[in-house]
Amino acid sequence: MKETIISDIHCIITKPDRHNLITVVVETNEGVTGFGCATFQQRPLAVKTMVDEYLKPILIGKNANNIEDLWQMMMVNAYWRNGPVINNAISGVDMALWDIKAKLAGMPLHQLFGGKSRDAIPVYTHATSDTMEGIYDLVEGFLEKGYKHIRCQLGFYGGVPTDLHTTQNPTEGSYYDQDQYMDNTLTMFKSLREKYGNQFHILHDVHERLFPNQAIQFAKEVEQYKPYFIEDILPPNQTEWLDNIRSQSSVSLGLGELFNNPEEWKSLIANRRIDFIRCHVSQIGGITPALKLGHLCQNFGVRIAWHCPPDMTPIGAAVNTHLNVHLHNAAIQEHVEYNGNTHKVFPNAAEPINGYLYASEIAGIGVEIDREAAAEFPVMYRPHEWTQSRLPDGAIHTP
């Protein structure tokens, strides 16, 4: 097979909407260019530096066809490995290499994987509001569009706090009360079931906001409303408590968006402590490890629901769709509809049709970046207040 030599690599950071989005561009001597998602929006410049200063020098002149070898080299070259900055940087290159290979083969990415196991993947979207009336309005609109799975949140993560009993001169941060959050969320579930019955599946993201004993209680009480799954009921460093939850509740659990290292998910899958793996594909290093993870999950009856939030390029979202139509144990894909600027920067970005996402049939990933349009929306960074989550006494808590 003729070698395809990597001739250049660079990063593009753009902010067409609320989030800084990072795209890696890999060029070859064959004139075929690949694009990959490397978005770590809280540390965009760190990822760009990793790509431009550390990965590019070891990749120029290498054969782009040897994806597995290049992935392994990128992962171990710094000796220290499996962190969010390096994994996202590797992901951007890895996705771009798969994009190149599929373009050279003249087939869409899912066909390169081995073809489809389904026609399309069901989608869930987000209905978030500070009031139940606001949630109802959003739900009505999504039902009209054909969605059958909706993640419902009363307020931002941690809920809508009222009458917080804080300290004098409290430390700056985003405050919430765990008991209020649990009570309000259970009331939300009850109200949605009373109003809509089983017209749609309800999902909910705890987003690590509870202590383990509270998570057990919440899982027991929310079970009666039959959520499709409860996401991130515990942080990654408390997953041994999942056995306690499993022994007291049959509620379906999704976990994994913060995972970087295979050691974080292997025992959860092998011991069937979760129902859905929620890894963020760029956060674990791209397509190469995602395919392996998907196959591992299938052996243990764990289904796939990749993390696919707005702070991901449409390139990364398209990769998720290709993975989902290929992997037999894929269950659902998260999606928040794009604004006009995002469609301008990323032509062919897919939107759901009647509650389903369809994989592109264009050779490669099927979504690229318009570099001129991207330049209209330069990177902007500010510290994120929502990740400075605090309890009423001022103690910081996992966001």
Curated annotation (Swiss-Prot):
Which of this chain's residues are annotated to bind Mg(2+)? D205, E231, E257
Subunit record text:
Homotetramer.
Instruction: Report the protein's function.
Output: Has no detectable activity with D-mannonate and with a panel of 70 other acid sugars (in vitro), in spite of the conservation of the residues that are expected to be important for catalytic activity and cofactor binding. May have evolved a divergent function.
Domain of life, per the record? Bacteria
Which InterPro entries does this one have?
Answer: D-mannonate_dehydratase-like, DgoD-like, Enolase-like_C_sf, Enolase-like_N, Enolase_C-like, Mandel_Rmase/mucon_lact_enz_CS, Mandelate_racemase_C, Mandelate_racemase_N_dom
Report the SMART domains cross-referenced here: MR_MLE
Name its GO BP terms in alphabetical order.
amino acid catabolic process
What molecular functions are annotated in GO for this chain? magnesium ion binding
Please give the positions of the paired cysteines in each disulfide bond.
none
Q: Which organism is it from?
A: Vibrionales bacterium (strain SWAT-3)
Q: What is this protein called?
A: D-galactonate dehydratase family member VSWAT3_13707
Signal sequence annotation? none
Q: Which SUPFAM superfamilies match?
A: Enolase C-terminal domain-like, Enolase N-terminal domain-like
Question: Which of UniProt's keywords are assigned here?
Answer: Magnesium, Metal-binding
Gene3D superfamilies given in the database record: Enolase-like C-terminal domain, Enolase-like, N-terminal domain
Q: Which family does it belong to?
A: Belongs to the mandelate racemase/muconate lactonizing enzyme family. GalD subfamily.
**Which residues bind D-arabinonate per the record?**
H207, E257, R278, H307, E334
